[in-house]
Amino acid sequence: MRTYVDANVFLYAVLYDDARSQRCRKALEAIVAGRLEAVTSLLTWDEFSHVVERILGREVAVQEGERFLRFPRLDFLPCSMDVLVRAQRLRANTALGARDCLHAATALLAGATTFLSEDTDFARVPGLTRQPV
């Protein structure tokens, strides 16, 4: 079963050093080791890179963005018109923000019904099972 990995899992792993960030790093290690079949949107790079730059600066964001794009055993899913249409439907029928609708729509269309995220809003998306880290 494929698991969609939300941007916040990558962000916590890079930005912080606490119990939650350690759990995020362990989840990412499980992907690298092949114990977790994982996908995320290509758009996750945008969110990840933007937040890392805002907190740690442009140079670190460029380095971490390059590492992110080479992440082993992580499948990057495209943003298609089908994703946008599904995201728009989610936007109309849930309280999710636009970017979160894109993530949820990408997961649903890819059949990745387990959604690894620290964001509790995803627990209310029909068809997804939010899995906290």
Where are these regions (language model features)?
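Short, well-structured N-terminal submotif of metal-dependent ribonuclease cores
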Residues: 1-40, 53-63
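Alpha-helix capping/helix-boundary segments
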Residues: 9, 44, 83, 103, ...
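Histidine- and aromatic-rich ligand-binding microenvironments
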Residues: 5-6, 40-41, 96-97, 119, ...
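Active-site-proximal, substrate-binding regions of enzyme catalytic domains
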Residues: 47-49, 53-75
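Active-site neighborhoods of divalent-metal-dependent phosphate/nucleic-acid chemistry enzymes
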Residues: 25, 74-116
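A general alpha-helix detector
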Residues: 9-10, 47-51, 86
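Acidic, PIN/NYN-like endoribonuclease modules and their adjacent C-terminal/linker elements
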Residues: 2, 104-133
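Structured helix-beta-strand junction loops
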Residues: 33-35, 71-72, 125
